[in-house]
Amino acid sequence: MNYWLMKSEPSAFSIDDLQQMPEQTEHWDGVRNYQARNMMRDQMKVGDEVFFYHSNCETPGIVGLMEVVRESYPDHTAFDPQSKYFDPKSSPDQPRWYMVDIKYLRHTRRILPLAELKQHEALEHMPLVRKGNRLSIMPVSPAEWNYILRLEDE
């Protein structure tokens, strides 16, 4: 099993939105960065666990846990001219972009703010806390995952 962190602006799609979806499951669409796409397409597997991270908001941070319940498949929003994620170079025959389905597991017991995560030496190598890393999807090591879960109770 792998661990991940996936970012979303809560004004676009929040942990509460995911919790309210039918079966608390939704596809994670709109990823338009090749490195993030490659991780989602090539490495994410059913059963992988994911931190849900709220970005571009008053208190950016980890707000919940999700699970990958369907491995990558073509992102249909890339084919829709009415979608903000439309890509004229992507087609059903030759898709350029992919998505996975994720399922809500739970909210974290408290928001784990980015500012707090940056203060922990044990997380200094985590892509999230390093300068210049703006990927919307990133791997989390098992040690980082377990450390962050322990922070919920502090």
What are these regions (language model features)?
Residues 1-46, 144-145, 152-154:
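Compositionally biased, charged N-terminal/linker segments
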Residues 16-17, 78, 113-115, 148-151:
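A short secondary-structure junction signal
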Residues 44, 60-62, 79:
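Short glycine/proline-enriched turns and hinge-like loops at secondary-structure junctions
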Residues 53-60:
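Short, charged beta-turn/beta-strand-edge "cap" motif at the junction between a beta-strand
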Residues 64-131, 135:
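Aromatic- and Lys/Arg-enriched surface recognition patch
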